[in-house]
Amino acid sequence: MGKTRRDLLVTGSRVAAGLAAANALAPTGPFGAAQALADPKSKLRRPGFGLAFKSLKDETFLPSIDLDGKLPQWLTGSLLRNGPALFEIGEEKFNHWFDGLAMLHAFSFKGGKVSYRNRFLRSSQYWAWQREGRIKFSELATDPAPDPCRQIFSGVSTLPVLGRIPNANVSIEKLAGEFRAHTEIPIPVRFNPKFLNTMGIGDAGEMQGRLGTAHPHFDPETRERFSYEVELVPPSGLRIVSEKGRTRRELAFIPQAMPGYLHSFGLTRRFVVIVSQPFNFNLSKFLSPDRGPIITNYEWQGEEPTRIILVDRQRGGVAHTVETDSFFAFHHINAYEHEGKVVVDVCAHKDAGVIDALYLKKIRSGSKVPQARYRRFEIRLEGQGKMSQRDLIDAYIELPQKNYGRVNGRHYRYAYGVGLRKGSSGFIDQLVKADVKKGESKLWREWGVYPGEPVFVPRPGGKAEDDGVILSVILDGRRRKSALLVLDARNMEEIARASVPHHIPFGFHGLYAS
């Protein structure tokens, strides 16, 4: 693979080196890469970026896609991805990136070749598109056109009698051999990983909460699955639950008059870690006649603290609560216990403004999206429970991944994510490998290419934490199509890429299934 295919950087103070490397990527055209990246008025600074939020309506199966490079022989499974792919239905438009119709993607590896398949999740919203040609159900930031029959809680109702299949466009979970798509409504949608056909919703026992997490945790040692549910109506609050087989246990219920928005949580050997942030649900506003979509009923109350709550996994109940200045986080990176402290690493935003920045009108216009810092909190378990915090690396990071099976809930060194180059405007333009031991990062960046979540796949038998590959679905704006990028996870150098003949809209999360 020639050096003109990648821009490999090691962060620190090497801005000049980064620009020099970008110059080596100069495309054909009136501007070199470095100039286009640096000049905010340059039309070339984000070529093809509009495709990231352009609908993809076609479902397809490609038994073999173009491959540049050579795949590791041990890579024989499938990368499964989830994300929005349809942003309008007829004349009606979804408002937010989080609202688009869910599409599943599968890149499968066999005999050194790569096949590709995509398929819409057959949600109730999907069938409304097919049968009625309209947006029928509420999403996070989009309500359907006025309908006198619409129930006030239609956007968040999880009652199984409704037969509602949610638009589960966020993440994928493998549990007991079953593959499930998730969103923040706690009804998983089962699907076949080979053909991507929708197989129905999960058990009714999982539907007690109004909202839930798209990122449950599974502990392979205890065989427990952990999640939470948020009750928006009285008695409102946060319920922490664990499941083992068919046994479900409520670890804690934390009353909250105005429940805060949650997307993920952390897990250590002893604790469930909740970051309760002051982006609070206003029930009275939600019940008013002029209420808007569900997310518009949340209010950022930055004068309130963000609370880190530790729930005891074995005994149940809240073991510790500490407070810090307000911040907002979608994603936990990791959490673990070390030398009498609980270490909590998150992608920390200044406030909840990132949600507003991800409305489609704003993001398509090229508005800069607020970026998250790699922030560590250390909570002492003895005495007054004092807490310290610091940012671990200089680079921004979001959509974090790690060697999950090896280090989740345990002491670790490496994490991976997406980010935006310092000083640039826009959304995402690089992949990040964080070394929290050294406080350094390695970056992969290529001009005009926009990467997605990096999924780490460990090499069978590998001893080092970072011995494996990174799989990231990238949008090549210059060629106006997407590809699967394969990097060596140790040095972030490209091994191969497999291209599809069309664009794939920006997605959220996925996993590798062997």
Task: Label each region the model flagged.
Residues 238-245, 289-314, 359-381, 429-436, ...:
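Beta-propeller blade signature
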